[in-house]
Regions:
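Short, structural beta-strand-to-alpha-helix junction motif
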Residues: 14-26
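General structural signal for alpha-helix termini and helix-helix connectors
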Residues: 25-28, 48
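Short, hydrophobic/amphipathic alpha-helical patches that form generic packing surfaces
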Residues: 37-48
Length: 102
């Protein structure tokens, strides 16, 4: 997912750096239970994806207020990112592993 921040295009990356930044900011591990956690993680992903980014959390809130679809797009991107990661780690059950009942 790409996002334009202050005239700069940033390619978002879901990395360990994002999780570490989130833990430092939130004081807990990432476990999205509400909009605050998702927005904090969105901010953390941006910071991890562009180390030179000069975005304050309040700026992100302004961006989302002006374009609420950003949070929907981010949530969809994040879900896809976690699914891919789980698949690559072998955490997803294969369809053929469960025998069909006769």
């Amino acid at each position: 997912m790409k996002i334009n921040i202050k005239g700069r295009e940033v390619e978002l990356k879901n990395t360990f750096r994002s999780m570490i930044i989130y833990e430092k900011v939130a004081g807990k591990t990432f476990n999205p239970q509400g909009i605050t956690e998702i927005l904090l993680y969105f901010y953390s992903v941006i910071m991890a994806s562009d180390k030179d980014c000069e975005l304050e959390f309040d700026d992100l809130l302004d961006m989302v207020d002006a374009n609420p679809k950003l949070i929907t797009d981010f949530s969809e991107w994040l879900n896809k990112s976690f699914r891919i990661s789980n698949y690559l780690n072998g955490d997803v059950e294969k369809e053929n592993e469960n025998p069909k009942k006769a």
